[in-house]
Amino acid sequence: SGLVRLDEEAGAVIATYNAFAGSLVREHGLRIGVDPDSTLITGARAWQIAVRIVEERTAPLPVDRPGAAASVLLALEGALSENLLTVDEAAERLDELVALMEGIGSVRGCRTLVRGAPEALTARLGMLEAVAAYRDYKRRHALLDFGDQIALGCRIAEEAPEVARQLRERHRAVLLDEFQDTSVAQIRLLSALFAGSGVTAV
């Protein structure tokens, strides 16, 4: 399960953030339409899938070599998961950034400051399309990667308040080690589950 029972009588449990989120997905994934028996894939398997996605694309990507493009795809997909963004949300923000760069370029004396930026940003939309294909592949084959665990766990915590209530009753005190306060996904997951209860972060 990814969890290690330290003291059966006291009910103490220790887990990494990913293992804890993964247990939420296994126990409550059906609440958000996720197969609880989904397979957690390794980084190597994720890279193989990403290479396949890249090689099957007919539209050009901003990175030519399949291996390099796959690495960029996975990094981008991980960033979206970390910030709990859908591909559509990221594309919308990218469009806004393109419009901003074009606006700056239209100001007298500022064109050289943003030369090539709108075109480079627009090219990134193709990479977002590849990310969408990668996510669709995982969904169709009931696969999860490590980034999915916390993102899906967060969805469960926010959309199923009864789960949070059960966990707060089960774990009266929570100690967070090496908590990443820059991680949107971690903050939202743990806030949805344990805000207002006995939580200590170190």
Located regions from the model:
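Conserved helicase NTPase motor core
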Residues: 13, 38-46, 50, 116-202
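Conserved ATP-driven helicase/translocase motor core recognized via long
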Residues: 48-143
